[in-house]
Amino acid sequence: MTITIEQPHLDAIADRKVAGGGGGDNAAELVLDGGFVVPDSNAFGNAFRNYEAESERKETVEEFYRVNHINQTYDFVRRMREEYGRVDKTEMGIWECIELLNEFIDDSDPDLDMPQIEHLLQTAEAIRKDFPDEDWLHLTGLIHDLGKVLLHPSFGELPQWSVVGDTFPVGCAFDECNVHFKYFKENPDYLNPKLNTKFGAYSEGCGLDNVLMSWGHDDYMYLVAKENKTTLPSAGLFIIRYHSFYPLHKHGAYMHLMNDEDKENLKWLRVFNKYDLYSKSNERIDVEKVKPYYMSLIEKYFPAKLRW
């Protein structure tokens, strides 16, 4: 099955615009007329991504980042990419993978403690409402977190610190905008002169495709999609690999590593992030009602069975 997909152009979407540029909390925020309304607080009554707010999840989340920042090294990421990039663990369809995630809750997320299928459908449906003609973006919303299947026993039952959480480049200096930055000081790469400078193992404008990111569900699903020859546009693959890269799309860090294609795709990632982050709620989606639509998109952009 071969489908030719043109790269989407954000500027061509009527009644939508990306305002601002560079970093910052409001950088490139999507402006929608009568579209998705950003809620004031998360399911726990706190501001979204508030890692200091007292809540029942605060200690769990901080301990997660402590272990994550200590162990996500350049060598560790290379080993994990080599192991899981072979996509030889099993074969299954996209929807089968979605159902596997039902039993998992993300320990790095301060905003939600519901099974992952709820978040996937909330994200996809919110995007679908505001971007009805961008079916590739609906599907990207549905599958962006499927790499969390690494938590399942069939995939080695990896610890959460190596599957979820904000991502960041390894092989160069850790930026101070990273959540709980202080714990990087215990990472072996922190004092390695070959890996702790601004560019480290990379060069200016080398392109994020050439940068190793901390290992987790983002990079894994990106590898799975590429190895199974998805026909999603490059913006979809960019969203999958970098949707947890908050230092970039929230704070504007690490932009010196990006090339021109990355900068164009970043516009779509910032659009996507609004739905990924703010659609999290305790409202339930009728799975059986929306399943036929998403099954049609899966058939359009992926083979029936994927190698994982």
UniProtKB/Swiss-Prot annotation:
- Coiled-coil-forming residues are none
Q: Which cofactor does it need?
A: Fe cation
The record lists the catalysed reaction(s) as:
myo-inositol + O2 = D-glucuronate + H2O + H(+)
**PANTHER family named in the record:** INOSITOL OXYGENASE 1 (PTHR12588:SF12), MYOINOSITOL OXYGENASE (PTHR12588)
**A Pfam family recorded for this sequence:** MIOX
Function according to Swiss-Prot or TrEMBL: Involved in the biosynthesis of UDP-glucuronic acid (UDP-GlcA), providing nucleotide sugars for cell-wall polymers. May be also involved in plant ascorbate biosynthesis.
Compartments, as annotated in UniProt: Cytoplasm
Binding annotation for Fe cation 2: D145, H217, H243
Q: Which GO terms describe its cellular component?
A: cytoplasm
This chain's protein is named Probable inositol oxygenase
Q: Which family would the database say this protein is a member of?
A: Belongs to the myo-inositol oxygenase family.
Q: Which residues bind Fe cation 1?
A: H119, H144, D145, D276
This protein's pathway: Polyol metabolism; myo-inositol degradation into D-glucuronate; D-glucuronate from myo-inositol: step 1/1
Highest taxon above the source species: Eukaryota
Task: Report the cofactor remark.
Answer: Binds 2 iron ions per subunit.
Enzyme's top EC category: oxidoreductase
Its EC number is 1.13.99.1
Cytoplasm found in the keyword field: yes
In which residues is substrate bound? R49, D106, D107, S108, K148, G165, D166, H243, S244
Which source organism does the UniProt entry give?
Oryza sativa subsp. japonica (Rice)
Keywords, alphabetical: Ascorbate biosynthesis, Cytoplasm, Iron, Metal-binding, Oxidoreductase
Example of a GO MF term: iron ion binding
What's a BP term from Gene Ontology annotated to this protein?
inositol catabolic process
The record's listing under InterPro entries reads: Inositol_oxygenase
